[in-house]
A protein has these predicted regions:
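S-adenosylmethionine-dependent methyltransferases
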Residues: 1-231
Length: 231
């Protein structure tokens, strides 16, 4: 049997060349095609890719289950995204933001990795989306202007030391009546942030998606956060 990824391009990086793979997201009668360096659907795969960071494996452009879950969530909520502005943090392969853009949102994708933004652009073009803005940005030195109806991010809460920086971004870039949509595999540090926000009278709710192989699906929460002034 021929390899369906045989004719896909190779991602050339400072860490070497990485073969790209294709993932197809199907939801609500639509289909999106995303290129990535590999899927990280299980805890075992996650541990492996994190353990190989010493060889500069481009884990940011791998396809993570939280990205798939967030993209599915957005696709099921088309009316809430059409005509809206969206800021995506830690865009990676770009899947959630690309889905939002095809639904009619005006999207700005940010990442601190130029390689990720390169793949975001390529994946946008692959799906017929040319309107997305791409910006290199570091949460610890954030100067992104503008306010957005939605701030979205897939699995961006894994570094607890970065939570204060993310909180400042939420405060500075969320529009009046804006909302935040973050997907996460129920990491302990992420749940602590949710508890802290609830204690500050934020509205916190979530939908659960099971992503991965049928025998061992991984539960992912897509958390919607609304600050007190926007409730």
């Amino acid at each position: 049997m021929s390899d369906p990824n045989a004719n896909l391009p190779v991602l050339d990086t400072s860490a070497g060349e990485f073969k790209l793979h294709e993932y197809k997201l199907r939801q609500e009668g639509r289909e999106w095609s995303i290129l990535h360096t590999g899927t990280v659907l299980t805890l075992e795969a996650e541990s492996k890719i994190i353990g190989e960071r010493s060889v500069r494996l481009p884990y940011g452009v791998a396809l993570w289950p939280s990205s798939i879950a967030l993209a599915h969530e957005i696709a099921t909520r088309e009316r809430e995204f059409v005509g809206r502005t969206v800021l995506e943090l830690g865009a990676g392969t770009g899947l959630p933001g690309i889905v939002a853009a095809t639904l009619g949102a005006t999207v700005t994708q940010t990442d601190r990795d130029e390689l990720a933004l390169h793949l975001c652009r390529s994946n946008g073009q692959r799906n017929g989306v040319s309107s997305i803005q791409h910006r290199l940005a570091d949460w610890t030195n954030w100067d992104e202007p503008g306010r957005y109806d939605w701030v979205i991010g897939a699995d961006i809460l894994y570094g607890e030391s970065l939570h204060p920086h993310l909180r400042r971004i939420f405060d500075s870039n969320l529009a009046k009546r804006g909302r935040i949509l973050l997907s996460d595999p129920f990491r302990s540090m992420s749940l602590r942030l949710m508890e802290a926000l609830e204690a500050e009278v934020w509205k916190v709710s979530f939908d659960r998606w099971d992503v991965g192989e049928e025998t061992t699906p991984r539960p992912i929460g897509v958390f919607e956060l609304v600050p007190p002034d926007n409730i």
